[in-house]
Curated annotation (Swiss-Prot):
Amino acid composition bias (Basic and acidic residues), ranges on this chain: 45-56, 233-243, 252-264, 709-718
UniProt record, GO biological process: DNA repair; monoubiquitinated protein deubiquitination; positive regulation of receptor signaling pathway via JAK-STAT; protein deubiquitination; proteolysis; regulation of DNA repair; response to UV; skeletal system development
Domain USP, chain residue ranges per copy: 81-784
Primary site of residence: nucleus
Superkingdom of the source species: Eukaryota
Record protein name field: Ubiquitin carboxyl-terminal hydrolase 1
GO CC terms of this entry: nucleoplasm; nucleus
Family in the record: Belongs to the peptidase C19 family.
Site (Cleavage): G669, Q670
Gene name of the encoded protein: Usp1
Subunit note: Interacts with FANCD2 and PCNA. Interacts with WDR48. Interacts with ATAD5; the interaction regulates USP1-mediated PCNA deubiquitination.
């Protein structure tokens, strides 16, 4: 029966799988539980898992492995401050870095900030501030951009100085946040709200345009204040001439004019108020004084009347004169006509011509003597106002060439600072173009001038698109490398007007053929060249960017440039490249912006002594929101990773990385704190820095009781201040020497990261041999 045994075994094998499966599952489960409890199992899989778990533990627990990395980061840190990305704000960070290193920009912003801070203090001291508050809010809002720029400049300089003096405190990064400036831009232009990518050239035009408007507003306010002061002084002189008597208001005005004269340099002429100073004591006997007063006055209609009639009519004439002078404020020509009967037959200049040519009129009035004494009073007060406001940074009248000998040098020095301040954009970035049209028949020329702040040049020929459509083999045919001079020649090319677009000549009196050219008439200190790297493309349509795709055609860019070929007059000016804004990406609404800046002019570097105070004072004096509460208040609902420096007595190297987990929409970025509140807190950082020193001095004086101890302490404090001044000078010289190591080197600013770029690598990225995605977008040349 051997054949039956295999059949039984087969039958068992058929019915056994279910049983074996049950047994095998239970067996494997028991085996896994044993593996979990048995620590002496030496299988290969267990060894692998133990090694993997051990590696995980080794990566987390020891801190010694991460220390070499931090040391390398500390060595790689450069003494240049980056800017944190606050959510697709690389377009703003790159422009701010270029403006920071732009020659003369920081000086002009500081000058404007000092003027604005003085104006704000004047508004606080004004008794009628409540009545004028509504009309001053708009001007303060327009001043906020200047205050935000100055606040950012101060924070960058202080952080740079702190790093150079204490480099061991900074291990992670050396960067600050332009949050206040970003909030100001969002207030001025709601387009920058949210976290969308924007054009770097547009934000540059927005910043420069608002600075220019602020400068014009400051000019108008200074001229208005000067006109109001001249009107008030003129009213006082007219009241004296009309009434012939002395009232309480005249006594106050005479005292004010006497105080004014004491402050001014003395001349060889006398004022009428000096001869009448004795009459102030005898103001009770008006009837006896009326006769000598009328003899000293000019020939007016009031002299023909009797003495009693004059005294009775005096109080009636005063309000009439005041009303006429008040109504004459809007138009100065009318005031000249109405008040002409009070003056002699000689022609009197208008008020506007007075404060436009103060020196000339003042010298003429002094030579004529007593008949022009009242006008001399007006000119004296106007001279005082002009000198005070010029010394304080206010506008100086263009015609004030003849000045007192003592203040001529001061005015000439302040005039240059005033021009840099009020004409910051015009001097640095704004030039003038001439559109010249020449008739081909009569050879007559017509010119039209317009201002420009940047030059937009092409990077490829217009016919290239037609070639791409006709070519079937290669979508990007190889073309010869274009240069920047070729691009500028395309911008200033001669255009021939023919056919239906003929030019109507005024000399020929009919339509003729003409040539139109664009030339440079006035060149600024800094030339901004905008490369038109984005063009409309139907094949690669970008719904967010409006169909603008990137043109990656390389353009040969020189380090030195001369525009004499396209200028209206011969010039020897040459420009050197000092900054480039690069764009990497394929569309205008995406990608990333970086800035490359060449460090130059460190020998003429001017550092503020307020940036080299003690760390505690430095932290208290920073106008940027540096504490956690202020940063959270200004951050609002930002969903990005930012670094916050702890204020107070903490070290500035402590960096806290915070991230909000609240969900926000595409157009988020709402602000919880208004910009003017930040302006009120940090409009004058010098005062904030100075307050701890004053508190220490007051505490020291309160501890002493005797005068001798106070004098000793004053001597010690004076010695300490001398030592501190020497220490500040040593710190400043050390910082300057440390920065001179980077003279002539190119720095790459990639938001918060700063790197040194070799000149060869920079030239390769500037004029690449291939067509990379990272190409130059904005070129900045400064006058050499």
């Amino acid at each position: 029966m051997p054949g039956v045994i295999p059949s039984e075994s087969n039958g068992l094998s058929r019915g056994s799988p279910s049983k074996k499966n049950r047994l095998s599952l239970k067996f494997f489960q028991k085996k896994e539980t044993k593996r979990a409890l048995d620590f002496t199992d030496s299988q290969e899989n267990e060894e692998k898992t133990s090694e993997y778990r051990g590696s995980e533990i080794d990566q987390v627990v020891p801190a010694a492995q991460s220390s070499p990395v931090s040391c390398e980061k500390r060595e790689n840190l450069l003494p240049f401050v980056g800017l944190n990305n606050l959510g697709n704000t690389c377009y703003l960070n790159s422009i701010l870095q270029v403006l920071y290193f732009c020659p003369g920009f920081k000086t002009g912003v500081k000058h404007l900030f000092n003027i604005i801070s003085r104006k704000k203090e004047a508004l606080k001291d004004d008794s009628n501030q409540k009545d004028k508050g509504s009309c001053k809010e708009e001007s303060l809002a327009s001043y906020e951009l200047i205050c935000s720029l100055q606040s950012l400049i101060i924070s960058v300089e202080q952080l740079q100085a702190s790093f150079l003096l204490n480099p061991e405190k900074y291990t992670d990064e050396l960067a600050t946040q332009p949050r206040r400036l970003l909030n100001t831009l969002r207030e001025l232009n709601p387009m920058y709200e949210g976290f969308l990518q924007h054009d770097a050239q547009e934000v540059l035009q927005c910043i420069l345009g608002n600075i220019q408007e602020t400068c014009q507003l400051l000019k108008k306010e200074e001229i208005k204040n000067l006109a109001e002061l001249s009107g008030k002084v003129e009213e006082q002189s007219l009241q004296k001439e009309e009434t012939g008597g002395i009232t309480s208001t005249e006594i106050d005005s005479m005292r004010n004019t006497e105080d004014v004269k004491e402050q001014l340099p003395k001349g060889n002429w006398k004022r009428k108020s000096d001869s009448e100073s004795s009459n102030v004591k005898k103001k009770v006997k008006l009837s006896r004084e009326s006769q000598p007063l009328e003899e000293n006055q000019r020939q007016t209609r009031s002299k023909r009347k009797a003495i009693g009639d004059t005294l009775e009519a005096a109080p009636k004439i005063i309000p009439k004169c005041v009303s006429e002078s008040e109504s004459a404020k809007p138009s100065q020509k009318k005031s000249k006509v109405k008040i002409n009967w009070l003056k002699p037959s000689t022609k009197q200049p208008s008020i506007l011509s007075k404060f436009c040519s103060l020196g000339k009129i003042t010298t003429n009035q002094r030579s004529k003597g007593q008949p022009k004494e009242k006008e001399g009073d007006v000119e004296e007060d106007l001279e005082k106002y002009g000198s005070d406001h010029t010394a304080n940074g206010g506008p100086e009248s263009p015609g004030s060439s003849v000045t007192p000998v003592d203040s001529s040098e001061a005015k000439s020095g302040n005039k240059g600072a005033e021009q840099i301040g009020f004409e910051l954009v015009e001097k640095l970035f704004q030039g003038q173009l001439v559109l010249r049209t020449r008739c081909l028949e009569c050879e007559s020329l017509t010119e039209r001038r317009e201002d420009f702040q940047d030059i937009s040049v092409p990077v490829q020929e217009d016919e290239l698109s037609k070639v791409e459509e006709s070519s079937e083999i290669s979508p990007e045919p190889k073309t010869e490398m274009k240069t920047l001079r070729w691009a500028i020649s395309q911008f200033a090319s001669v255009e021939r007007i023919v056919g239906e677009d003929k030019y109507f000549c005024e000399n020929c009196h009919h339509y003729t053929e003409a040539e139109r050219s664009l030339l440079f008439d006035k060149m600024p200190e800094v030339i901004t060249i905008h490369l038109k790297c984005f063009a409309a493309s139907g094949l690669e349509f970008d719904c967010y960017g409006g169909g603008l795709s990137k043109i990656n055609t390389p353009l040969l860019t020189p380090l030195k440039l001369s525009l004499e070929e396209w200028s209206t007059k011969p010039t020897n000016d040459s420009y050197g490249l000092f900054a480039v804004v690069m764009h990497s990406g394929i569309t205008i609404s995406s990608g990333h912006y970086t800035a490359s800046v060449k460090v130059t002019d460190l020998n003429s570097l001017e550092l503020d002594e307020g940036n080299f105070v003690v760390d505690q004072m430095c932290e208290l004096g920073k106008p940027e929101p540096l504490t956690e509460e202020q940063a959270r208040g200004t951050a609002g609902n930002y969903d990005d990773e930012v670094s916050i420096r702890v204020g107070g007595n903490a070290q500035p190297s402590k960096v806290l990385n915070k991230k909000n987990v609240e969900g926000i929409g595409l157009l988020g970025g709402q602000k919880s704190k208004a910009d003017y509140e930040l302006y009120n807190k940090a409009s004058n950082p010098d005062k904030v820095v100075g307050t701890p020193f004053t508190d220490n001095r007051n505490s020291e004086t309160n501890d002493t009781t005797n005068g001798t101890h106070e004098s000793d302490r004053n001597k010690e404090s004076s010695d300490q201040t001398g030592v501190n001044m020497n220490g500040l000078e040593n710190k400043i010289s050390y910082v300057v020497q440390s920065l001179k190591e980077y003279e002539g080197k190119w720095l790459l600013f990639d938001d918060s990261e700063v790197k040194v770029t070799e000149e060869k690598d920079f030239l390769n990225s500037l004029s690449p041999s291939t067509s990379p995605t990272s190409t130059p977008y904005l070129l900045f040349y400064k006058k050499l």
